[in-house]
């Protein structure tokens, strides 16, 4: 799992030879970008992107705002896990998740930490049947180093590294690699 509030994603593999990807967009997107993502879903059946639309986090009071944020966080996490479960066909399940980076500040960091906690709890309950021995949490720099990128690499660097030198050879011919090669500019600039 690569978690973010606006675009969390997961890679699913049973054998490190075949891969499926799921993602949830959780922000307002232009009609043209929505159409673009729908096209990706059609062109690459092993990639499944769900759009939740624009978040509504503003309430009339502090309590109302926090309730709306929590509703949005629960919808985001449950939609992501529901989508993953449609692609998982074997047990036991092993889950790797990227730990959060501390680049965010203030309330956005609090929201990321809170939502990541909800995600971990949901993974425990719904994917791992509360058996946490199947959960592995990696620091962002560990994951970047594992693919051959620098620990402080940004998303563009990670995309480039994945396209140019995937560490799992089968990933070179995966739907995600083909999609990134074909639509890299559209994906990283939107």
Which residues make up each language-model segment?
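Phosphate- and other anionic-substrate recognition elements at nucleic-acid/protein interfaces
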Residues: 1-190
């Amino acid at each position: 799992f690569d978690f973010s509030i606006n675009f969390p994603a997961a890679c699913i593999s049973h054998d490190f030879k075949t891969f499926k990807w799921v993602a949830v967009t959780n922000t307002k997107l232009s009609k043209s970008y929505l159409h673009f993502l729908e096209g990706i879903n059609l062109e690459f059946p092993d990639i499944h992107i769900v759009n939740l639309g624009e978040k509504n986090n503003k309430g009339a009071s502090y309590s109302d705002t926090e309730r709306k944020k929590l509703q949005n966080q629960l919808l985001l996490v449950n939609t992501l896990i529901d989508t993953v479960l449609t692609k998982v066909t074997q047990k036991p399940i092993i889950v790797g998740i990227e730990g959060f980076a501390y680049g965010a500040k203030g309330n956005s960091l609090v929201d990321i930490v809170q939502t990541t906690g909800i995600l971990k709890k949901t993974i425990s309950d719904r994917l791992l049947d509360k058996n946490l021995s199947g959960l592995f949490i990696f620091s962002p720099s560990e994951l970047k180093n594992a693919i051959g990128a620098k620990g402080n690499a940004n998303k563009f660097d990670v995309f480039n590294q994945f396209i140019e030198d995937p560490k799992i050879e089968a990933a070179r011919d995966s739907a995600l690699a083909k999609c990134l090669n074909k639509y890299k500019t559209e994906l990283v600039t939107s």
